[in-house]
């Protein structure tokens, strides 16, 4: 069973590690797109900072989440990606980018699948190397 899960696990882990990482880096270069255009006017009006500054903060979060997934925090990182993509989708719906919102919701399903496959592989939410062997979320 573990071999079969690996065929699913590794492509998902690499994808959901690299995509947020690269998207986060692109928040500083805008090579892929000008990300500020995707912030809905409703969201922009609630920000206590410029949209550009907000997108830089978003970039940092995406870089950290991508690294977490790539470095073995896959089960927890996958769930963070699910929540992150759901929030992005809500913003995109408010901005009228329905096609992109649907794409991000589909990606959220894939991230959920990654987290569930990691759970099936008996991965902890936080790898033991990060906790010095202590299992902070272990079931009693």
Pin down the residues of each PLM region.
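Extended, low-polarity transmembrane helix blocks
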Residues: 1-33, 48-60, 64, 70-140
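Perimembrane loop-to-helix junctions flanking transmembrane segments
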Residues: 36-50
């Amino acid at each position: 069973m573990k071999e079969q899960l690996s065929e699913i696990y590794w492509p998902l882990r690499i994808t959901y590690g690299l995509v947020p990482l690269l998207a986060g880096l692109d928040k500083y270069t805008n090579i892929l797109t000008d990300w500020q255009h995707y912030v809905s006017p409703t969201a922009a009006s609630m920000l206590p900072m410029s949209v550009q500054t907000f997108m830089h903060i978003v970039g940092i979060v995406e870089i950290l989440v991508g690294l977490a997934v790539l470095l073995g925090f896959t089960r927890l990182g996958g769930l963070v990606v699910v929540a992150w993509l759901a929030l992005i989708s809500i913003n995109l719906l408010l901005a009228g980018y329905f096609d992109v919102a649907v794409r991000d919701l589909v990606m959220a399903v894939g991230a959920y699948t990654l987290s569930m496959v990691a759970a099936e592989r008996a991965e902890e939410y936080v790898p033991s190397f990060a906790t010095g062997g202590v299992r902070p979320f272990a079931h009693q």
